[in-house]
Regions:
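N-terminal helix-cap/turn-to-beta initiation motif at the start of protein domains
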Residues: 26-39
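Exposed beta-sheet edge/beta-hairpin loop segments within beta-rich domains
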Residues: 126-128
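Bacterial N-terminal signal peptides
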Residues: 9-21
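Central antiparallel beta-sheet cores of small beta-barrel/beta-sandwich binding domains
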Residues: 37, 42-119
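Edge beta-strand at a domain terminus
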Residues: 100-105, 110, 130-136, 140-166
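N-terminal secretory signal peptides that target proteins for export/translocation
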Residues: 1-5
Length: 166
């Protein structure tokens, strides 16, 4: 048996042992955000923001949101949050019919997740943080007209029943 054959056998055995654990750690990525599933809402006078997330399945969560002002939908988004081959999460968002933008997770724990895309103009970061029974989402990036400054917009959601009623 030559040296190459002696190395390939153990390498294949190691791969067979490690692949299931790699797959389960990736599955755990989407599963760690199971607390995000359900319906979330912000009431701010004549403006209502609603966001809804599916349960994590198949390495994905699906999300949608809309902003209604004075009884008219003025913004909407569709999101797929998916596990990547690199073991991270990708946040692919299509806002109000525009082309999708992908952000990649830079931080993930049981209390929240932060996604980043430094090539995007604004936002460059998108985050979801669990706050008890509430949810704080935020977006952040360079402030327009203020070089070197960050602009951050927060969305303090409260959990609501997914009844479909106003």
């Amino acid at each position: 048996m030559n040296a190459t054959c002696r190395l390939i056998g153990p390498a294949i055995a190691a791969a067979l042992v490690l692949l299931p654990s790699l797959a389960s750690s990736q599955a755990a990525g989407a599963q760690r955000l199971a607390w995000l599933q359900g319906c979330w809402r912000i009431d701010a006078g004549s403006r209502i923001v609603e966001e809804q997330w599916s349960a994590p399945r198949g390495g994905t969560l699906l999300g949608s949101s809309r902003t209604v002002r004075d009884g008219k939908t003025v913004e909407h988004e569709f999101v797929i949050l998916r596990e990547t081959a690199e073991g991270r999460l990708a946040y692919e968002v299509s806002p109000s019919g525009r082309a999708p933008t992908v952000f990649t997770s830079i931080s993930l724990d049981d209390a929240g997740v932060v996604f980043e895309n430094l090539q995007h103009d604004f936002p460059q970061r998108v985050a979801y943080q669990r706050k008890g029974d509430d949810l704080l989402a935020w977006i952040e990036g360079p402030a327009r007209n203020a070089p070197g400054q960050l602009r951050r917009i927060e969305y303090p959601y409260r959990k609501v029943a997914c009844t479909g009623e106003p």
